[in-house]
Every structure is written in C-alpha cells, then in structure tokens.
C-alpha cells in the first residue's frame, strides 16, 4: 500500500505496454503503407522504432535496436530504388521512362482516387515507351519489364519493413 499522492511502480505498470502497443500499431500501419503506397511505409516503421528508443531514454539494448533499424532503413531504401532501376534499364527501358512513370504515378495519385498511382504510372510508362519504340507490342513488353522492376522494389521494401518490425519485436522482448 502506498500513501495518497505518491506514485508506485504498480500504478505505472500499463504505461510502457500502452506505448509499445502504440509503436506496434504505427509500425503495422507502416508495413501496410509499403503494400498500399499511400503512406511512407518504411519511414513510418523506422520513425516508430526510433521513437521507442528515444522516448524511453535509450539504454544499450535499445540503442543497438535503433542502430539496426537505421541500417536496415538506409539499406532497404537504397536497394528499393537501385535494384529495380538496374533491372528496368537492363531490360531496355531508359531512366527517362522510369522518371515519367514516377511523375505519372504522382499525377494519378492526385487525379484518380485509390487506383491513380497505378493507372498514372503504368499509363505514363506505356506512353513513353510507345513514343520511344513506335510499336505497341514492344512498348507493352517494356512496360511489363518496368512493372516487374517496380514489384521487385516493393518486395525489397516489404521485406525490409518486416525485418525492422521483427528487430523491434526482439528488442521489446529483450528489454
């Protein structure tokens, strides 16, 4: 029993767990943001993990988790752009086509709710390749190569987000 007005460890028992549930929820939203590219998924997962490290005062284990999360975030972010770009350009699509596809996806995001990113991105890539190649079949094959490359990037980002979530989970269990 404790005196009125004092705080006992027992009275705060739910606060860290509630904070960790909030971090977990943000991380799950981040993973979903990788699959449905409306939110910056990988960044959300990383920011939630770093917030967990920082807001609770750090400590050696948490700092190691924070460093691991940051390394995974940087490596995953670089890989999700570099590897698909190499794959697409290796299939014959120039970087200008990739940039036009990104611009089309961005425009589609604002112009067509829900599916605009896909419609705008694919449409822009196909039109760019049609202008460049002057043949619908060749443009479609090139568009598929770019779509496969984008899929590779999404898989890399998803794998990184899941690894980050797993790293954080181990950190929670250890601390």
Where do the language-model regions lie?
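Helix-adjacent hinge/juxtasegments
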Residues: 64-108
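Hydrophobic alpha-helical transmembrane segments
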Residues: 20-24, 46, 66-71, 98-102, ...
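Short amphipathic alpha-helical coupling elements at transmembrane boundaries
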Residues: 52, 86-93, 138-149
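Juxtamembrane boundary at the C-terminal end of a transmembrane helix
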Residues: 164-175
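Transmembrane alpha-helix interface/packing and boundary motifs in multi-pass membrane proteins
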Residues: 28-44, 104-114
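Alpha-helical transmembrane segments of multi-pass membrane proteins
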Residues: 26, 30, 52, 72-81, ...
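Interfacial segments of multi-pass membrane proteins
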Residues: 44-61, 104-109, 123-132
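Juxtamembrane interface at the ends
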Residues: 84-90, 121-137
């Amino acid at each position: 029993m404790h005196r009125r007005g004092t705080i006992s460890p027992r009275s705060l028992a739910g606060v860290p767990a509630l904070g960790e549930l909030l971090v977990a929820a943000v991380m799950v939203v981040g993973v979903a943001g990788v699959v449905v590219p409306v939110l910056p998924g990988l960044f959300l997962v990383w920011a939630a993990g770093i917030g967990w490290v920082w807001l609770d005062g750090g400590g050696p284990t948490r700092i190691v988790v924070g460093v691991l999360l940051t390394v995974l975030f940087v490596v995953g972010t670089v890989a999700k752009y570099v590897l698909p770009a190499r794959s697409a350009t290796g299939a014959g699509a120039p970087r200008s086509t990739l940039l036009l596809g990104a611009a089309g996806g961005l425009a589609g995001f604002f112009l067509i709710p829900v599916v605009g990113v896909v419609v705008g991105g694919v449409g822009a890539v196909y039109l760019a390749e049609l202008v460049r190649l002057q043949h619908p079949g060749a443009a479609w094959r090139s568009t598929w190569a770019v779509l496969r490359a984008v899929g590779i990037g999404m898989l890399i980002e998803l794998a990184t987000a899941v690894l980050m979530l797993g790293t954080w989970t181990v950190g929670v269990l250890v601390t």
